[in-house]
């Protein structure tokens, strides 16, 4: 947002996804920062005002502060493209690639970026016993991470410690999500890195008090997640995680800012996912890394 010809900024925030609260907080933080820089700022919340009512004659650029479904999966971006209005963050295809964990993992593997072993199942075509057979065939083990294919902010992410957990969690999640991904749980350090305009700017380490870095650990002060900046890595590995982050950003075709989520275990970095609409709240990691 350094281009001063973009003086009139429309911040789109809120929306109707499960990440609405985070989006509102991110949007408010961005509005405050933009006003401080003397931009003319207007707002739109798709929950209360149809996004089709955007009047492109009154704005120069859209700051997309939406999170989750329709906001960071290429849907909103495709409408911005239709209106021919410049907007922040990644484009249609890269947003879809990053939001769909199966697509992004496939791209990671094709580009030799290490990611945890996984497979997916659709509720309409798989039974629990069939999924169990696939687990055995693919030599996957417990604990196992089970997550929706296209959700952000760790919504719906669960960890199964045994087959009893696995069955209970899978049946529960299939009530709300059509497709799930099953992924080997990787121990070790939780590392996240920020990339801005293709350049990785830093990496932070997280020590959650909860079982893992879930939604509450990310956005609740009460969760008491410890942030260590910079991450406790030697010089070689610190440079390596930044390099992988930048590579993944480019592989997915991203632009602007992204956040890469890793586990560092036995001297290897496992890339979990790329977030194209990272949070901008006072608890969010990208602002902390940037500062």
Can you say where each PLM-predicted feature lies in the sequence?
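Active-site nucleotide/adenylate-binding loops and adjacent lid/helix of ATP-dependent enzymes
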Residues: 1-13, 41, 56-57, 97-189
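ATP-binding N-terminal substructure of ATP-dependent carboxylate-amine bond-forming enzymes
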Residues: 1-99, 103, 122-132
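Short, intrinsically disordered, charge-balanced linker/junction segments flanking boundaries
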Residues: 116, 288-291
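Phosphate-binding site of ATP-dependent enzymes
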Residues: 161-243, 263-270
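Conserved metal-phosphate-binding beta-hairpin within the catalytic cores
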Residues: 184, 193-195, 249-282, 290
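A short, polar/charged loop-to-alpha-helix boundary motif
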Residues: 211-213, 217, 281-289
């Amino acid at each position: 947002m350094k281009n001063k010809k973009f003086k009139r900024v429309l911040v789109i925030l809120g929306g109707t996804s499960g990440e609405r609260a985070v989006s509102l907080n991110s949007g408010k933080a961005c509005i405050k920062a933009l006003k401080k820089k003397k931009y003319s700022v207007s707002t739109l919340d798709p929950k209360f005002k149809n996004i089709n009512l955007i009047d492109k004659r009154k704005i120069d650029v859209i700051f997309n502060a939406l999170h989750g479904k329709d906001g960071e999966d290429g849907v909103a971006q495709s409408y911005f493209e239709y209106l021919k209005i410049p907007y922040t963050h990644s484009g249609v295809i890269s947003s879809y690639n990053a939001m769909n964990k199966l697509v992004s993992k496939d791209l990671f593997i094709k580009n030799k970026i290490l990611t945890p072993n996984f497979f997916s199942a659709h509720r309409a075509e798989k039974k629990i016993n069939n999924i169990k057979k696939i687990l055995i065939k693919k030599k996957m083990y417990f604990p196992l991470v089970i997550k929706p294919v296209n959700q952000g902010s760790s919504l719906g992410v669960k960890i199964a410690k045994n087959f009893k957990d696995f069955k209970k969690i899978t049946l529960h999640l299939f009530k709300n999500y059509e497709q799930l991904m099953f992924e080997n749980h990787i121990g070790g350090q939780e590392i996240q890195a920020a990339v801005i305009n293709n350049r990785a700017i830093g990496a932070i380490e997280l020590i959650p008090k909860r079982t893992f870095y879930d939604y509450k650990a990310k956005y609740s002060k009460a969760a008491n997640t410890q942030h260590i900046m910079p991450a406790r890595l030697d010089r070689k590995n610190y440079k390596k995680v930044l390099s992988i982050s930048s590579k993944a950003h480019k592989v997915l075709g991203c632009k602007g800012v992204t956040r890469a989520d890793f586990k560092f275990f036995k001297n290897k970095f496992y890339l979990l996912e790329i977030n194209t609409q990272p949070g901008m709240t006072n608890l969010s990691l990208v602002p902390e890394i940037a500062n």
